[in-house]
Amino acid sequence: MITAGQLRASRALLGIDQRKLAEAAGLSLPTIQRMEASEDVIRGNVDSLMKLVAALDALGLELIDDNAVSQAGGRGVRLKGTPP
């Protein structure tokens, strides 16, 4: 679904801190901190993960999974356009 690295990269692209992401996703700051401290793919409550992915989408980010076609291959994240 989403890796800790993708989550950190997402925040960096948006220029927001963990607290702002937590607010946007309707999650607690400790939840975001635990997610970012995860090894590789974030595991946890499905509802929390769905809220996180929906918030990143609403903020203008596109998650790239392992199966996406890209020159570099692998997972990543990119801006859809100008962030809101």
Pin down the residues of each PLM region:
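A detector for short, charged/polar N-terminal pre-domain segments
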Residues: 1-2
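Residue-level recognition of specific faces of alpha-helices
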Residues: 6, 31-34, 55, 76
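Short basic helix-loop element that most often maps to the first helix and adjoining turn
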Residues: 7-20, 81-82
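Residues in the recognition helix of alpha-helical DNA-binding motifs
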Residues: 10, 24, 35
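Residue-level "edge-of-site" marker
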Residues: 24, 45, 69
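Recognition helix of helix-turn-helix/homeodomain-like DNA-binding domains
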Residues: 27-44
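DNA major-groove recognition helix of helix-turn-helix/homeodomain DNA-binding modules
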Residues: 46-63
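Helix-turn-helix/homeodomain-like alpha-helical modules used for DNA recognition
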Residues: 61-84
